[in-house]
């Protein structure tokens, strides 16, 4: 049953990856402000950021495929795993007994049975399976966190129905309810993975029954939750709304600071003193930052630099350094390479399961 359930999870996971691939490709050239420590950092692109989400789901897919490929059955070995009853049944015929487990495995569509066991299969199997689900949940949670933060910034939003109510008191609100639900369920699955680990660790000898009730709760509930999580992810990715103008506005407000290295190099090439220019940029950057933070003004760093004769650069010259594409490095190229070399071959090999959609009621 767990094997069949993992196959269903795999199908939905592939569809989430496929939708993310479309989103990444469509937005691979759209520059956006990157964040480290949630502080402005060197720009990336919207599509490149999506590949980070996708890569983690791809890692989950690899782990899932490995576990699926190594799943085995318990077989039939008796009350303590010694096959003692079969010795009696087959009059000690070892060759006949050796054929039993391979026949069971073939009948059930597995490659093999576990060579040794107690009364049950090792509960470590449940641990491996729930760890796969927990890994997917962790990837989904990270994705949902980023969407929630981006929605706060008004750069990217999850789908929002025309009749959806964001807040019972504040009618104007557009709360990221789907992403919040992903986070909530994901935390449950990640914690749920502790159950089979503890059960496996606390089994006595050939078997104790304290595994049973816990397993009957933790395993099916983990699968039910991850099924809902993947439906939510599929729905969110399929309906993501990007606001390029907001993204551009925020990027341009920070870009003058990030362009200072290029500005300084251009000024040095024109005959300026590097040490002097470095100190002036430091001082002017502090003035511009103070204007933005303390007085709520626009970033006027370029105007301050243009007014300083040490740089010998006009505002028009400085504006030429403001092309965001100059600061995104190989982001778009990385997206193309990642899709071509990593994602698309997997999607092509599994194209018969693609095309799923998910409808969510909020």
Question: Which residues fall in each region the model found?
Answer:
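Long, non-coiled-coil amphipathic alpha-helical linker/lever segments
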Residues: 1-42, 109-125, 207-212
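Amphipathic alpha-helical coiled-coil segments and their boundaries
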Residues: 2, 6, 50, 122, ...
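Short, well-ordered beta-strand elements within core beta-sheets of diverse protein domains
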Residues: 4-5, 48, 127-135, 262-270
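Internal glycine-rich alpha/beta core junctions
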Residues: 11-14, 18, 42-202
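Long, hydrophobic, amphipathic alpha-helical segments used as structural scaffolds
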Residues: 13, 17-31, 35, 61, ...
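Short glycine-/small-residue-rich flexible loop motifs, especially phosphate/cofactor-binding loops
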Residues: 21, 102, 264
